[in-house]
């Protein structure tokens, strides 16, 4: 299944947030969206997921989700949003309860996603007993339990310390190697984007337009072995971000 934005523009009142955005998220592909604060990254994700309708253009779905998918699109946010009165297992089972899944099948699904996210030993733990990184693992396991065609991820690691972020990036890469999931991944962290993205889409300052698209051919699991190449890509993105910031400063000076 493929998600497509076709010449999408969107405004909030008189403020134009996105302008003429066309991009796609293909099967088995992680597309990272980066750009200055306020450039419309989260708005773009909401439009992709059908939570908002664009003022112009269209958000389209091409193809079919997996036959055993309970929900073709699912979100992972910065906020883990775990119910404190449910265990880890109970938080994951919550999203299956509206799908009339047989109890034995639900148990098998939960056991599988717990194993894939390295949470099997914590099935009966309460959210208050978990670190931030463990809570985000639960959120990812919950998203995977419905076997989505595409995960929409809005800064899922930004609330975590740098060491935990590194560990979870390793886990996501390992998980992608097992499952080959598709994702649109919003981040302000360029190192994160270069580590996780098959494609990186940089938006300009508001109104967000596609300034640059960078394809990275190095396999995800091997990028740690190519520090010079990934550093070059990151520097290229950083220079583009810096140019955007300088242009914004000049515009403010002209107004003043």
Predicted regions located by residue number:
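Helix-to-loop junction immediately C-terminal to a conserved catalytic motif
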Residues: 49
């Amino acid at each position: 299944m493929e998600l497509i934005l076709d010449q999408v523009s969107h405004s909030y009142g008189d403020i134009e947030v996105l302008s003429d955005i066309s991009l796609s998220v293909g099967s088995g592909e992680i597309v990272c969206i980066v750009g200055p604060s306020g450039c419309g990254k989260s708005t773009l994700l909401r439009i992709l997921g059908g939570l908002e309708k664009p003022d112009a253009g269209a958000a389209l779905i091409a193809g079919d989700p997996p036959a055993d998918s309970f929900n073709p699109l699912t979100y992972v946010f910065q906020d883990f949003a775990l119910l404190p009165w449910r265990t880890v297992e109970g938080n994951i089972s919550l999203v299956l309860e509206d799908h009339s899944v047989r109890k034995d099948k639900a148990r098998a699904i939960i056991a599988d996603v717990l194993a894939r996210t390295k949470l099997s030993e914590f099935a009966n733990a309460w959210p208050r007993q978990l670190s931030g990184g463990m809570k985000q693992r639960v959120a990812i396991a919950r998203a995977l339990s419905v076997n989505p065609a595409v995960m929409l991820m809005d800064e899922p690691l930004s609330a975590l310390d740098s060491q935990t972020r590194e560990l979870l990036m390793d886990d996501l890469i390992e998980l992608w190697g097992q499952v080959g999931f598709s994702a649109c991944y919003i981040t302000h962290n360029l190192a994160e984007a270069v580590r996780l993205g098959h494609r990186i889409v940089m938006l300009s300052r508001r109104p967000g337009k596609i300034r640059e698209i960078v394809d990275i051919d190095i396999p995800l699991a091997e990028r740690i072995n190519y520090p010079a190449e990934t550093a070059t890509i990151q520097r290229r993105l950083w220079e583009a971000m810096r140019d955007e910031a300088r242009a914004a400063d000049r515009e403010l000076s002209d107004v003043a």
